[in-house]
Amino acid sequence: MSESIRLSDHFSYSKLLRFTLPSICMMVFTSIYGVVDGLFVSNFVGKTPFAAVNLVMPFVMILGGMGFMIGTGGTALVSKLLGEGKKDEAHSTFSMMVLFTLLLGLALSAVGVLTMPAVARLLRATDTMMPDCVLYGRIVTGFTFTFMLQNVFQSFFIAAEKPRLGLFVTVAAGVTNMVLDALFMAVFKWGVAGAAIATGLSQCVGGVLPLIYFLRPNSSLLRLHPTALRLRPILQACGNGSSELMSNISSSLVGMLYNFQLLRLIGEDGVSAYGVLMYVQFIFVAIFIGYSIGCAPVVSFHYGAGNQNELKSLLRKSVLLMGLGGVALTAAAMLLASPLAKLFVGYDADLYALTTHAFRLFSWSFLLAGFNIFASGFFTALNNGAVSAIISFLRTLVFQAGSVIILPLLLDVDGIWYAITSAEIFAFIISCTFLLAKRNKYHYM
């Protein structure tokens, strides 16, 4: 069982999969309950509110992405300290990251609530979409601080050698969201406000339960205790995790660009179709992200301990697993395109046909996505936030934005659906280049 596996162990394929499985399940389940949110809005509220939620979602994810940055960057730092045998410093740094997350999250919650009408206008919400954009956005961003805490603790549960407990918390949050979605939208008919409240309350479960656990005496590697904020560790953690923030911001900005292009070329149906693709992509890519999150503390620990042979083994095994996973998920996406589109938008024949066609073109991106996500996470785990951020920035912003702008000129609307695959191909080249260039510094080859 994964609770018996220690960061200091030698990891076979079996042990690596057992250790990372809870974080994979955690990320997949997080994505699934996000998808359920979309399903309820689309089927019980309508396609215009569904488009409104999808339009404002990138801004919400940018705010929440700060939690991913602190969580992944802080976990890399804390795991390295544990590998070096500096347990007291690891506890202090962990406590500092949680306090910083809480304070920053409260500030961002206020910003989100106050600026939402201006944000909706900036995102070019139509007159029919504007009320739902503002209502949903204000409620959800009001819970940004709990969303950030949830994201931070997802990473730290793994460093604390409690991945299964992290999975339990995620499942509890997800079940809360799904039950409240059904209650607020299907029974009480609260519309997008119900979806937003359900999401916010589920994030309270995901953010507050771990806080209580780590504040109390526990059997994990980490403890929370009173601490002061120190600039250097915070900047170091933010630097390490900058690729995760960059990925979040870039994906959100590119999502806005997709929406602009689709509104121009197709209209609201294009935004709705793209929303379906994003919800399903969350689930598929969550497998790769979950593996990278689960593997990262192991890489950081052995890097801190100077175990070069284990680093080589972890990289070799991970590359093979990402390759096999890419093939499997691409095949699954092709086969499931039609039924998944029907699940979301089967009530509208034209929208269903558009979504199915788009999904089949979009699916090729999964072939290389896992490798690129792991490469970025691998450098974060090695405490090289700069390289990780470059890979992430190029992959999620530069290459995708360029493709979304250029490919429609050559392939019309199909160019939009092929854009992400084009970006993954270029990112694969960059990832391979950095892995080869840095091999002598870190001795992982």
Regions found by a protein language model. Give the residues of each.
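Hydrophobic residues within alpha-helical transmembrane segments
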Residues: 21, 25, 56-59, 99-103, ...
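Hydrophobic transmembrane alpha-helices of multi-pass small-molecule transporters
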Residues: 62-65, 177-182, 207-211, 282-286, ...
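Helix-terminus/linker motif at the lipid-water interface of multi-pass membrane proteins
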Residues: 32-50, 120-127, 183-190, 252-283, ...
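Short runs within selected transmembrane alpha-helices of multi-pass transporters and secretion channels
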Residues: 71, 139-158, 169-177, 195-208, ...
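Small-residue-rich hydrophobic transmembrane alpha-helices
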Residues: 50-110, 147-166, 273-337, 369-391
